[in-house]
Amino acid sequence: MQHNLAGKRAIVGGGSQGIGRAVAEALAAQGAEVLILARGREALALAAAALPTPLGQKHRWISVDNAQHEELSASVAAELLAWGDAHILINNTGGPKAGPLLEASPEAFMSAFTNHLIVNQRLAQLVVPGMLRAGYGRIVNVVSTSVKAPLHGLGVSNTVRAAVGNWSKTLATELAPVGITVNNVLPGATSTERLRAIIDGRAAHTKRSAQEIEDEMKAEVPMGRFADPSEIAAAVVFLASPEASYITGINIPVDGGRTPNL
C-alpha cells in the first residue's frame, strides 16, 4: 500500500541500523523528509545518505546519546528550529542487556528507564507543539511484544517496556482530542544485531550452539521464522500515515503470531 507522506517531516530514533533504519527508509520512500538519531556519526551519515529521495527530500541526522537526555533535547530542539515542525515521531531505542531480574543492578534499571521512557517523554514534549501548529501528529513507539507477555531472560527489558506501554496509552488519551495519535508497534523476534546478541548470549549461558538456540526460537513462532526489519517498518509507516487517523492508543504485535494473548 502506498501512503502519501509528501511534505511530512519525521524523526526516527535509532535510525542508523536495524528496525530504525528500515523505518527511516520506508518513511522516506513514501515522501517524508527524515531526521535520524543515533550515536555513531559514521553509521548515521551513511544511513542518511542512503535514504530514498523520490521527491527530492533533504534528509538529516544528529549524533546523540540517549543517556545524555538533556543534551539530546537541546540538539533536537536546535535542529527543529532550522528544519521546521516535525509531523511524525518514531521512538525507537535498542533494548537493555538481556538477563534475569535478580542479576540486574539498579543502574541497569535507571539506564533503561532513561534510554526509553525519559527520552520518549522529552522528544514528545519537543514535537507536540509543532504537531499542533501543523494540524498533523503521529507518534509511534517501537517497543516489544513483552508489553503483552514478558519474555524469558529479558527482565529489565520486560519491566521498562511495560512502563513505555502505559506511558503511551496515557499520552494517546491526552492527545486524542487534538487529533494526534500515539500507538505502539510490538516487534517479535526480528533479524537484527540485537537478536543475534541474544542468541549468542543464550548459547554461551547454556553451553549449546547458536544454531540450536536459533532453531528453538523459530519453532516458537507459528510462522516458523524471524521477521525482517522491513516488515516491522510497514506497520510503523501505516500508523504514521493519514490513513491511520482514527487509530490511537493501541498495540500492534508484528511477531508471526507468537504472542499468546489477544
Regions found by a protein language model. Give the residues of each.
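Short C-terminal tail/terminal secondary-structure segment
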Residues: 1, 149, 236-237, 248-262
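Conserved glycine-rich cofactor-binding loop
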Residues: 9, 16-17
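Conserved glycine-rich Rossmann-like NAD(P)H-binding loop of the short-chain dehydrogenase/reductase
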Residues: 30-47
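Substrate-binding pocket helix/loop in short-chain dehydrogenase/reductase
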Residues: 100-102, 108-113, 139, 217
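Alpha-helical segment proximal to the catalytic Tyr-Lys
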Residues: 129, 173-174, 245
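Catalytic loop of short-chain dehydrogenase/reductase
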Residues: 140-164, 168-177, 189-190
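Short, small/polar-rich loop/turn modules that mediate ligand/substrate recognition or access, typified
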Residues: 176, 181, 247-249
